[in-house]
Amino acid sequence: MRKTKFWLVLSLIATSLSIFACKKDSTATKNPIPEVSKAKASTKLLNATTVATTDYELIWSDEFNSSGGFDSTKWSYADRGTVAWNKYMTSLPAYASQDGSNLVLRMDNAVVAGDPVAYHAGGVKSMGKFSMTYGKVEVRAKFTQGRGSWPAIWMMPEPATAYGGWPSCGEIDSMEHVNNESVMYHTIHNGSVTNANGGSTASKSATYNTTDYNLYTMIWSPNDIRFYVNNSLQYTYARVSGGGTQQWPFDVPFYLILNQAGGAGWPGAITNADLPFSMQVDYVRVYKLPLFSNGDFESGVIYPWTTWGGGSSVVSTDARTGTKCIRETGGETSIEQYLTGLTPNTTYRFGGYAKVSAAGQSVSIGVKNYGGTAVDATIGTTSYSNNSVTFTTGANNTTATVYFYKPLSGTVYGDDFYLEKL
């Protein structure tokens, strides 16, 4: 929950570092994965501008439909500290409780016996109760505006210092809002993008419905982190090859934080007439990434496949089924997809359909980096043919890379790729 734009933090004074265990400077600113993930099942998954609605397995959630205290098996109070965001955190139900349909996080200037601070505010964290590595997080929430207000939906690593203190440990801010602004912010923090003042160059403002609930979605994969508001993609932070942990500390578990902060750091002083501030959270839902996705390209984009070599594009001609397929042109060309969540010592089949534009050409479907020797199968027909490979993951391997590879010049097409657990 750092402040996101450099110009927003120039006037802020850096103070002590602390974020539970990962020293963050905040003065500135239900069911197992389906065994087969096939073809048309992922139609909506990787649309470039809208969030996925299929192929995700719900693994953790809180609907906040009770009254009184929050579920202590899932959350604990966000502790008060010495940095801006947690300066007024208060571990009392008056500041973090359920109202029958929402988690209500409140901030006011009420007098609390035995706690003589100017303001009291609420927040919760899932640290020690739930954390995740890769997946989709949906939070539906609304909040009030006011001078000095600072609600946020964000994540920090657990263990906290796997890659050092803040910001090297990493931070994912799905939503931050300050004061009366008509925009909210998505931000990434790490040792590469966070400057000395606590601001980040990996930040994006986005409009939102200022008077009602909004759905804030974060999709985190081994390749990138994507932020959506109301199912519309707003910002993507991509992993850089060779960037190391300074650029990508995002391969360890992170836990969730929801808070209504204010009165220090980025938003500045509170105008008491604007109190109380509150953030109402309708639900939090966390989903596991599918093993394999976008095998049919009906989304119209290549993601989460990556490309290298000649030209790779999704086209609306020559599809085997549906209306789209992948086309590779030019010289040596490949598309690849990095898979996570595989089971060690387990056999899978990866396959698909392909055709070449002229006799004598060929294209391969294969898998590598799974704990064994790369294997592939060749297709050289001018009409769609199916081929596949089987592979068994190593004793400690949970990842693999599948590919569609054209070794020479020419044009080939691919469609309806699939992954099966045997």
From Swiss-Prot:
One of its GO terms (molecular function) is keratan-sulfate endo-1,4-beta-galactosidase activity. InterPro entries: CenC_carb-bd, ConA-like_dom_sf, Galactose-bd-like_sf, GH16, Glycosyl_Hydrlase_16. One of its GO terms (cellular component) is extracellular region. The keyword Signal applies. It holds the Pfam family Glyco_hydro_16. Coiled coil: none annotated. Its EC number is 3.2.1.103. It is found in: Secreted. It comes from the Bacteria. PANTHER family: GLYCOSIDE HYDROLASE FAMILY 16 PROTEIN (PTHR10963:SF55), GLYCOSYL HYDROLASE-RELATED (PTHR10963). This is Keratan-sulfate endo-1,4-beta-galactosidase. It comes from Sphingobacterium multivorum.
